Amino acid sequence: MKGTITRRMISGGQAMIAQIVLKKGDTVPRHSHHNEQITYVVSGKLRLLLGEQGEREIVVAAGEVLVIPPNLPHSAEALEDTLDVDVFAPPREDWLNRTDDYLRKGG
């Protein structure tokens, strides 16, 4: 994983749930996917930039939820040490087959 980001996931036939741990300053580069994404921040705080140029900024804090529609480009930065739970429908095939290069490049 990129930087200090770690994840654990379980996938069923129709959906996937993942626990993501980020340290303050960790970033997830802009990307998009055909999956609907529901992000629940358990602890910490994330800044997400949504849109082709990151024109919409949303900060999601502990106890808050964000739904990201399919195919919407987005990136994220941990403003604090953060634990979040992401649900994807359908499951993220790129995560399952380890072709999610945007999360594996650099450090």
What do the PLM-derived regions correspond to, one by one?
Residues 42-43, 61-62, 80:
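A cytosolic small-molecule/anion-sensing beta-strand core signal
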Residues 54-70:
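Short acidic-glycine-tyrosine-enriched beta hairpin
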